[in-house]
Amino acid sequence: MLFAVLALFTTAGNADTGDSNRVIKATRATVLPVIDGRIGENEWPDATRASGFTDLVTGKPALEPTEAYISYDETFLYVAFKAYDKVPTGIIAREVLRDSRYSGGGDFGDNDSEDYLEVTLDPFLSAKQSDLCRFSVNALSTRSAKISGGRAGKAEWNGDWDAKATKTSAGWDAEMRIPWKTLSFPGGKKNLDFGLNFTRFQYRTRIKSQWSNTTPQQFLNLMGRWSQIEPPKEKHKPSLSLLPYALTTAKETGSQIRTGIDARYTVTPDFTIVSTINPDFATVESAVQTVAFSRAEQFVPERRPFFLEGANYFSAGSFYTFGPLFYSNRIGLFDIGAKAYGKLTPKDTLGFLTAIDFGDRVDTIVRYRHDISATDQIGLFASQSDVAKDNDHSGVVALDGSLRRNKVGLDYQLIKSSGLNGGGGAADLNFSYQDSFNFTSVQLMNAGRNIRSANGLFYFDDFKGFQVYHNWSREWRKGAWRSFSVDFFPSYTWHQDGTPYQRGGGLGVQFDTRSDWRLSTSVNHNMFDAQKDATIRFGITSGATNRFRQIGMELITGQQADKAYRFYAPNVSWRPIKNLDLLYTGGLQQFGGWRRQHILTGNFILSRTRTIGGRILVQEEPGSPATINPYISYREAGERGTETYLLLGAPNNKSFLPQVMVKLVFAR
């Protein structure tokens, strides 16, 4: 069977439609446009025009036309959009802070909560997410960028690019100016081709359209191409950017001053070194784990700038199988850290990271990826953690790869761990199929006893078997129902000695209405060893894609680990007055006693660079008194120059800590 599948991979072609893989020729700008959000007459005479956007869901021309323009010179790339709209009053723009995600879905949400325009560049033609540069703007001129590899939030590092937008009687216009030095691109070449796409999301109709149709599956190898670019002739000069900081903390017991520095050295246009000495994480608000029952350790998103910088170059491991091989939250405080990442060649990517806590712990991560083609890749991963006090030297090495032909995919990984209480291995093989309405995955898995990684997140060990996931979804352009999806996910595994481990599965259904209601339900029934999990979940949300007016409730009831179980999760996200955002999320679990969690977050926007915010975290465990941790903060950041932070309290404490912190970050 495996040989038959591999034969299919060698014979099947990649999906393509007439509106995919479009090509436009690069042109130099002789008339420099004024970036004011108004496309003036004869302001873009040299720019190449891109039109004929496609609705990704229907595959037909978008209902409202969009035009894009692109040109360049020795210093900048210039991009403009003209987005026509029959109902200009229906253009939605809400976010005002730079690098807002225009998203209704939190850390993993898609851009779906307001109108936006976006240009996507793939300078290495790799068709890999980690190599893409995305620049988007909403109708309030709020910029949002996702630079290749991942960047932290400081403007000096995230790129000093500009964008402006203006509503018109015919819709809205947008203009962008992107410095070459913001981009990673192949150096030493006289002519380049970039992967290119233009995207528009129209909130009123919920239509996402693209110039080069990548289909609902977002196949990146179907992006367009911007050809015959002549990059800047001036030879690249390595540049060094320094961000020293000073942090003063005043407590009842006294005060202290802490200093440190972050540095970013751009070796070439496609390779970067970042280092930090005495980093400060005390002022970074960490994400909070939910109190809901989970048989595996919960994944918590990373928010610390050092680990966000270049994060995509270290990504390895299947999130939905064994877990991520590098889980940066494993690394706590350290004294010095350094990372180097980027392209060795257009097809070879390297990431290296080390963090040293003198006298205690040293962590090292290495990730290498080779792009065989736009749809195929192979990679190596290595991780080592040396903890002196435990004499523990934990390591992991892994080989992984992926192939795709048309709508069929194959992913695999081989993992071997070593160290104290760890010496197991793991392997998985994942076959997938996806088209406009279906996604199916069949995974074969084998995890040995004692597989462990001090820097990774392994959900389970000592099992072998398979799991299946199937999703069927539809989206409609007319009628009361906007979208519908069904998920089915059976799983059958055994321990390595052959005794049953997990057997069962689940079924989920979700409806989204035209009026922005979301209704969902799911049923799960599993046996874990001799324990039964049997639950039913109900969810309802009003304003599902509008975080400024959203109310929801989730209820899970049934049985977990042979015990009666009930979980309530209310959430409210609201903007009661202009510039004031409030978010409440709760979790109440009845499972051999009550566990309660309440999180209230507030943020008042004084300007695009100044905010006042805070959070109150209340947690209660069975038989213990509740802990309450409030803190408030003032932040002046988001643009070039000195940043100022003032905090009362400690964001990541369990209970309130009476202290004041003042932090200044200087750009050099």
Predicted regions and their residues:
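Bacterial N-terminal signal peptides
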Residues: 1-9
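A short local loop/turn or secondary-structure capping micro-motif enriched for an aromatic residue
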Residues: 34, 43-44, 86-90, 143, ...
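Residue-level marker for the onset of beta-strands and adjacent loop->beta junctions
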Residues: 22, 64-66, 161, 259-261, ...
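Outer-envelope beta-barrel architecture signal
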Residues: 75-77, 131-133, 172, 190-194, ...
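Surface-exposed extracellular loop regions of Gram-negative outer-membrane beta-barrel proteins
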Residues: 235-274, 363-418, 540-552, 568-588, ...
